[in-house]
Amino acid sequence: MLKGAIAQRYAQALFELAVQENLDGIEAELQELVQCVEQNAEVAHVLYHPHISLSEKKDLMNKIFAGELSVTVRNFLNLLIDRRRQNYLLEIARVFARLADEARNIVEAKVASAIPLSETQEQRLHQELARMTGKNVRMVKEVRPELIGGVMIQIGDRVMDGTVAFKLQRIRQSLSHA
């Protein structure tokens, strides 16, 4: 809980600044920063290593990202380092993306199906989810053969499970209680 609250606070502060400056640009840079940290072990080592001094970390990060990140994002990273909050970077980026989506009236729908959906099925599902939520929908599709058939949709905390696997599970439960 503490990690989420800390990430929320920092993400909210950066978001408010980004709305004033350049929301799309700052969001893209933050994602670029996260991707670099996740994919480059040396960058992650410098950023997270407890025995590298704060000033060394800031100097190295500023050198690495000098031409890549705006002053705003570099200053934000320096703030995280100064406050020893760099371990929250990935969670902050996740919360920031959610805040940016909310500001743009976008909702993410995770759609899992046993086989890939046809283009027609995707379009119908997209339209129905947009109608249900009243928002623009970004679908993240996943194929999971263990679902047997049907579709499972997750939007935020809400899950709609119309899979064959779920229906079979409910039948098993009702038979075992009978």
Curated annotation (Swiss-Prot):
Alphabetized SUPFAM superfamilies for the sequence: N-terminal domain of the delta subunit of the F1F0-ATP synthase
UniProt cross-references to Gene3D superfamilies, sorted A to Z: N-terminal domain of the delta subunit of the F1F0-ATP synthase
Domain of life of the source: Bacteria
Pfam families assigned: OSCP
Gene Ontology, cellular component aspect: plasma membrane; proton-transporting ATP synthase complex
Subcellular location(s) per record: Cell membrane
Keywords: ATP synthesis, Cell membrane, CF(1), Hydrogen ion transport, Ion transport, Membrane, Transport
InterPro entries referenced in this protein's UniProt entry, alphabetically: ATP_synth_OSCP/delta_N_sf, ATPase_OSCP/dsu
Keyword field contains Flavoprotein: no
Gene Ontology MF annotations: proton-transporting ATP synthase activity, rotational mechanism
Bilayer topology annotation: Peripheral membrane protein
Function: F(1)F(0) ATP synthase produces ATP from ADP in the presence of a proton or sodium gradient. F-type ATPases consist of two structural domains, F(1) containing the extramembraneous catalytic core and F(0) containing the membrane proton channel, linked together by a central stalk and a peripheral stalk. During catalysis, ATP synthesis in the catalytic domain of F(1) is coupled via a rotary mechanism of the central stalk subunits to proton translocation. This protein is part of the stalk that links CF(0) to CF(1). It either transmits conformational changes from CF(0) to CF(1) or is implicated in proton conduction.
Family: Belongs to the ATPase delta chain family.
Oligomeric form and interacting partners: F-type ATPases have 2 components, F(1) - the catalytic core - and F(0) - the membrane proton channel. F(1) has five subunits: alpha(3), beta(3), gamma(1), delta(1), epsilon(1). F(0) has three main subunits: a(1), b(2) and c(10-14). The alpha and beta chains form an alternating ring which encloses part of the gamma chain. F(1) is attached to F(0) by a central stalk formed by the gamma and epsilon chains, while a peripheral stalk is formed by the delta and b chains.
HAMAP family attached to this UniProt entry: ATP_synth_delta_bact
Protein name as catalogued: ATP synthase subunit delta
